[in-house]
Design a protein with these regions (language model features):
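Short, low-complexity, polybasic intrinsically disordered segments
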Residues: 207-222
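Unusually extended, aromatic-enriched hydrophobic runs near protein termini
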Residues: 15, 106-111, 178, 199-200, ...
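General structural signal for secondary-structure boundaries
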Residues: 1-8, 180, 196-200
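Auxiliary tRNA-acceptor-end handling modules of aminoacyl-tRNA synthetases
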Residues: 1-45, 62-68, 72-78, 82-101
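Short, conserved secondary-structure transition motifs
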Residues: 188-208
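Positively charged, Gly/Ser-enriched RNA/tRNA-binding surfaces
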Residues: 43-73, 80, 90-186, 218-346
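Short charge-dense sequence patches
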Residues: 1-10, 112-128, 210-213
């Protein structure tokens, strides 16, 4: 179908809404009995989701939990997160279906920000993406995820408040996952936490004169593979010195501030079921997060390791306000992935 690309969304909707309305009225019972990958229901009981959500809400009792609209402004993820527009699902009326709960939470938080205090919002919501998964994985195009956002203003020293909130998101999510391991029947034997500073790979990307891929994630992965650098280091008080020995100097200050905040948590030092690493190989999220990012994986008793949580610092607040004093920290935990692969519930 050819149409004028300069046509407005409202004019396009004026054409498409009646067209789809007519098509809907032509459908039969046989047509609507058919399922596709977008309309098949989750196999997980809603009771199990509610049980897990209660653990999150009880622990995070100082965070406001909200119920997001399933529709968000068209382009929200392209504008804020740099997502390829083809990975979103638009509606014919000019919105897009919620595919990233953290960007939606960010807009809600930003609208409410009117003081120097941080705003923390969270939700457990079903999101949908058009990605095609291998049938063996049993992953659906729609899935539930816990998401959390914190926005606020920087204070002196610049960046310290921001990295403190990254550490808080991380330690809160570790604490909740440990509670879930304690309070439910599951096959989880432990957790691995991978800390990264994506500024390192971003800096290496800038030195490349001839790229083999225009995709920054792919190119950054190639750079790391050809660098001879280790994939991970054990995270401890010697990590910064080890990184300096490997030649990393730019971006060290923000990492030092983050590690001070992280190491100050008592729980960091006293849980044998949580292993900590610094991940030099991570390229995922290189244009999503500013610098510090983390990933939490769960390990089962048959050595299955799957990523459950991901978080870090974004530039969304600074970008939308044109004010570098704004910071944004976002994170998410795959609650559907957790229940499907690790929990043994009724």
């Amino acid at each position: 179908m050819n149409f004028d690309k300069n046509i407005s969304i409202s004019d396009l909707a004026w054409v498409l809404v009646p067209y789809y309305g007519e098509k809907a009225e032509e459908k039969t019972f046989s047509d609507i009995k058919r399922h596709d990958r977008f309309t098949v229901s989750s196999k997980i009981s809603q009771r199990n989701f509610l049980m897990i959500e209660k653990i999150f809400q009880d622990y995070l009792n100082d965070v406001e939990f909200i119920e997001l609209s399933p529709l968000q402004p068209l382009g929200i993820n392209c504008v804020l997160a740099g997502t390829n527009g083809k990975k979103n699902i638009p509606t014919i009326r000019g919105q897009e279906i919620n595919s990233d709960a953290t960007t939606a939470l960010f807009l809600e938080a930003y609208r409410s920000l009117n003081s120097s205090e941080e705003i923390r919002l969270a939700t457990n919501v079903r999101t949908i993406r058009p990605k095609i998964f291998d049938e063996k994985s049993k992953f659906l195009t729609h899935f539930k995820v816990f998401a959390e956002i914190t926005i606020g203003r920087q204070a002196s020293p610049f960046g310290e408040k921001e990295v403190f909130m990254i550490a808080r998101h991380l330690m809160d999510e570790i604490a909740v996952l440990k509670l879930i391991r304690t309070k439910t029947k599951n096959n989880i034997v432990g957790f691995n936490v991978y800390i990264s500073n994506l500024f390192f790979l971003k800096s290496m990307l800038l030195t490349i004169t001839e790229r083999k891929s225009q995709n920054d994630v792919i190119e950054a992965k190639r750079i790391w593979e050809e660098s001879g650098l280790p994939a991970q280091l054990i995270l401890n008080s010697n990590t910064v010195d080890e990184l300096k020995t490997l030649g990393f100097n730019k971006g060290i200050r923000v990492l030092e501030m983050f590690l001070r905040a992280l190491f100050s948590h008592v729980d960091f030092h006293n849980d044998a079921n949580v292993n900590w690493f610094f991940d030099l190989s991570r390229s995922a999220g290189i244009n999503y997060y500013r610098h510090i990012a983390y990933k939490i994986t769960a390990v089962s008793n048959d050595n299955l390791e799957l990523p459950l949580a991901d978080g870090g610092s974004n530039d969304w607040g600074a970008k939308i306000s044109n004010d570098k004093q704004f910071f944004t920290v976002s994170s998410g935990v795959g609650t559907e992935l957790l229940i499907q692969n690790f929990l043994r519930l009724a």
